[in-house]
Amino acid sequence: MKIAVIGTGNVGLVTGTCFAEVGVDVTCVDIDQKKIDNLNKGILPIYEPGLEEMVERNVQKKRLHFSTSLKDSIQGAEVVFIAVGTPPDEDGSADLKYVLAVAASVGEHMTHPLVIVTKSTVPVSTAEKVRKALQEQLTKRGSNLDFYVASNPEFLKEGAAIEDFMKPDRIVVGVDRPEAEELMRKLYKPFLMNGHPIYIMDIPSAEMTKYA
């Protein structure tokens, strides 16, 4: 299975590396060339116990790649995770400009159906905005490609993020199409071997769990 993770901060880098660890072909994407150059040299922008060794191992096994090209990275990918920052806006709400810019860019460059998943911490109704931003680009291209949106909030504690991802006490996935559910179940299957539950729900409910 092949995925792309957009954003190489704490959430993106941990997500991408942990999926690579269970055999998924992962490309982590960032617009910051220096960050990508450093990652390709094994220099990480964050510290998480166990992360550096895991990155090195999966880069050597050619399961984990780093790139500045979203266009190249989503070719052949079945799932694209948005894990970019959502800095607080002037009124304190999450600024979604980076999330929606990624969605628009995916819409501009996608060549096959895929699932686009919000992993960043976002307010309820973000998935609908992602859908709209992506659809606008497809319409502009005159394309009728199918795509599915999903919400998959993270529950990673700083300093224990690898442990939290590899041995989750729960996995929350919000979908509104069976195709998206099937792909997300397939992707998370290795993490369910120890009986950890996966909760499949509608998208707004999944978006709410981070605030519950």
Language model segments and positions:
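Structural/interface elements that position substrates and couple domains in central-metabolism enzymes
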Residues: 1-212
